[in-house]
Every structure is written in C-alpha cells, then in structure tokens.
Amino acid sequence: MAAEAHAPTASEYIVHHLQHLQNIKQKSIVDFSVVNIDSVVVGLVLGAIALFAFWLCARKATSGVPGRFQAAVEILVEMVDNQAKANIHNAESRKFIAPLALTVFVWIFLMNAMDMLPVDLLPAIWAQIYGAAGHDPHHAYLRVVPTADLSTTLGLSTAVLVLCLYYSVKIKGLGGWAHELVTAPFGTSKNPVFALILGVVNLLMQIIEYVAKTVSHGMRLFGNMYAGELVFMLIALMGGAAAMSLSGVLLPVGHIIAGSIWAIFHILVITLQAFIFMMLALIYLGQAHEAH
C-alpha cells in the first residue's frame, strides 16, 4: 500500500523525466546562467567516442580489402564529401567544411541514438548514485538525449550561423558583404531617398532571414527528438500500467508492439534528422559563398 501511495502519476513521471540536471534551478524561460549539465556531459562523451572510433578506423585502415567497419566509414565519408562538393564549390573551403559536416552528422546521430536506450535505464542508475551520495533520489534528474534539449540544438545552429558570417566576409570581403546586406533582395535605386528606404528594408529582411534560418535549423531537430522522447515515455507508461494492473491484460501486448514499431521507425528518424541538419548546414554555408 505504501509503495502504491508513493507511485508517481503519469504526469509526474513525464515531468520528472523532462527535468534536466542543472547547475542552478531555472527561474525563467530564458536564463543564460543555467547550464544543463546532463546535455553537456553526454554530448562531450559521445563526441569523444566518435573521435576515438574514427581514430581507430584510421589507425587500422588498409589499402587492401577493407573490413566491415572501414568500409562503412568509407561509404559515410564519400557520401558526405559528395554532398559537400554539390553545395560548396570553393575547393579551399571544402577542406574544412567537409570534415566539419562529417563530424556534425556523426555527432548528432550519436546524440539522437541515445533515445533508443530504455527510458528509465540511465536515470535509474543515476538515481542510485545520487541516493548513495546522501541526496534524495526523487530529485535525481537526468535527460540523456542532448538533441532533445533546445539549448543544444540552438547552440549548434548558432555555430553554423557564425560560420556563415565568417565565410560571407572571407569570400566577399567586408565591404562586399555589407553592400549585399543593404542591396538584397530588393536591389537599390539611383534616387538617394529610395536607396535609403530600400537599404533599410533590405537590411531588415537580411536580419530576419539569418534569424529565421538559425531558429528553424535548431528547432527542427529539437522538435523531432523531443516528440520522440515523449512517445517513448508514453510507451514506458503502458508497461508501468500493465505492471500495476491485473485487469489490463492487453497492456503488456500493446506495450511490446507499440515499443517495437516506434523503435524501428525511430531508427529512421534519428538518422534522417542528423542528415537533414548536416545538409542544411552545407546549404547555408554554400549560400554564404554565393553573391545575391
């Protein structure tokens, strides 16, 4: 009876699993003093794993018949390189952008793939560690999908924006880029008054375009992964309800079927979202090289 009395409701379960491990309690929607420690740590660990895997592949690479892992890496590298060549026509820029695109794809794929782990696996382990340290395990928060954190995805998209601005200035020159800001997309006029009006309108449109690209770039990845995380939580609740209810005979069956179907579908989602983010980054960087 005591266990049932303290069992969380469905809403409490979801709210608990959507809480981040943070350095301080967040008091407002936008608070730059808050650091989501779980997203940072998991992201860094996965990044280190990706680097180690590529280093290991490069170390064991052979010019003869490649092994399965080397063949998979070669296919991935060739795919990214082809996409980079299709969007970035400056060979010098591709020396940096192509490896960057490969890194972005693999890193985001690994962060997305954390959603395939059982919902309660790592949070339960963290709760045990947190409780063993003398803290209340009910306040042990941990989210293991960094890309389901808006801070992560907007951080990545902002980094792409910074690179776009850098290449715009590098390729076109500071004067050429500034001229583009006030002459595209509506052009200019020989009349000074109309030229001023068009310049202001063009500048506002350029700012809106940069902001819209950056926000939508990050929000697209976040929205898909956040929704996927919620669906997995709802499926986990089906299993929990089945464990606590003798009358819900079909709940375990529904739990297994729904979980299996969504997991198979989600493999496509996590791969596709990593590819889309990489492709948009390449497209935006390619546009930064072109004159409008």
From Swiss-Prot:
InterPro entries from the UniProt entry: ATP_syn_F0_a_bact/chloroplast, ATP_synth_F0_asu, ATP_synth_F0_asu_AS, F0_ATP_A_sf
Keyword list, A-Z: ATP synthesis, Cell inner membrane, Cell membrane, CF(0), Hydrogen ion transport, Ion transport, Membrane, Transmembrane, Transmembrane helix, Transport
Classification via Pfam families: ATP-synt_A
Localization annotation: Cell inner membrane
Keyword Nucleus carried by entry: no
Similarity field: Belongs to the ATPase A chain family.
Name of protein: ATP synthase subunit a
Gene that encodes the chain: atpB
